[in-house]
Every structure is written in C-alpha cells, then in structure tokens.
Amino acid sequence: MQNNPIIKQALNGTGITELNEMQQAVLKAGTSRDMILLSPTGSGKTLAFLLPLLSTFTNEEKKIQALIIAPSRELALQIESVFRSLGSGYKVNCCYGGHPMRTEKKSLEHPPTLLIGTPGRLVDHIERGNVDLETVRTLILDEFDKSLELGFTEEMKVILSHLPR
C-alpha cells in the first residue's frame, strides 16, 4: 500500500520521506482489519491510521465514510490538522464542545468524507438529527482508554449504536 499513488502523494505533501515501523505495519494491514495501536505520544500513530483511510475514500459518495472519535478537542483538532496536511482534497469536519453548534450543523448539511469529533458533541449532533452515521465504513477510536476514563462510556454506546452493523 505504501506504493499506492494516493499515499505517495500525501506523504510528499508532508515532507515525510520514511515511515516508521508501526506506520509501515499499519499501511501493510490496510483498513480491512481491526487493529489496536499502542505507542507513545509523538510516535506517529495519527499518520499511521490516517494514511490507509485515503485509499478507501471515494469522491462519488457524498456521505461520511469514516469516523474518528477523540476524547478531547485538542486531540480532535490535531487529527484534523494532520489530515489536512495530507492534502487529500476530501472534506473533513471536526465537531467538539466549545465550538458553535450552528456552525457545525451548517457544515454537516453537506456531509464530510471524514468526521472527527469528541463523544459528547457527536451525541449532541446525533440526538438533534444533524448527522447520519449509517454510511460509516471505518471507525477509529483514538485514545479510547482516555475516553472511558473521562466518563464517556454512555456517549460511546450511543455513537456505536448509530453505526452500521
């Protein structure tokens, strides 16, 4: 998959010339398998889980194809920033508390290819009917343990119940 032209182009845009061992392993596995990545902060996990997504997205579908749940707005914004740096051209939305709900709702009227959000804000959008997760093919739970530690268990259950089976 590292020879995939989409991934090569994305890497060229970041200035990264070589992937680390974990990133190579994730790229090799692709998105067809469930994975758990355990690695210290700053080790490149975000890039490792974003790169394989690029080869699964299609421009024909104007629906949410992947969902990333992060426990904090800071992490959600970091993931969004890394995704945008890949220069894929796919639409991405980031939803989190403290950001105007009206702005997020308006943006969600034209669904992104990738939706990133915090558990509480995603549940708000689900309950208000602002987001449809039925087309999500890939789910990434970044720092899932932290989400549970912060008490987002019920929110995670709500979100997961709205994903396709």
Give the ranges of each region predicted by the language model.
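Conserved nucleic-acid-binding Ia/Ib motif block in the N-terminal RecA-like helicase ATPase lobe
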Residues: 4-9, 61-127, 135-138
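Short, flexible loop segments at the rims of nucleotide/cofactor-binding pockets, characterized by
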Residues: 13-17, 91-95, 147-149
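Conserved phosphate-binding and hydrolysis motifs of nucleotide-dependent enzymes
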Residues: 23, 41-45, 119, 142-145
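Walker A/P-loop NTP-binding motif
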Residues: 24-35, 46-61, 74-77, 82-86, ...
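Alpha-helical transmission elements in cytosolic ATPase-linked domains
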Residues: 52, 107, 155-158
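SF2 helicase catalytic motif II
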Residues: 119-165
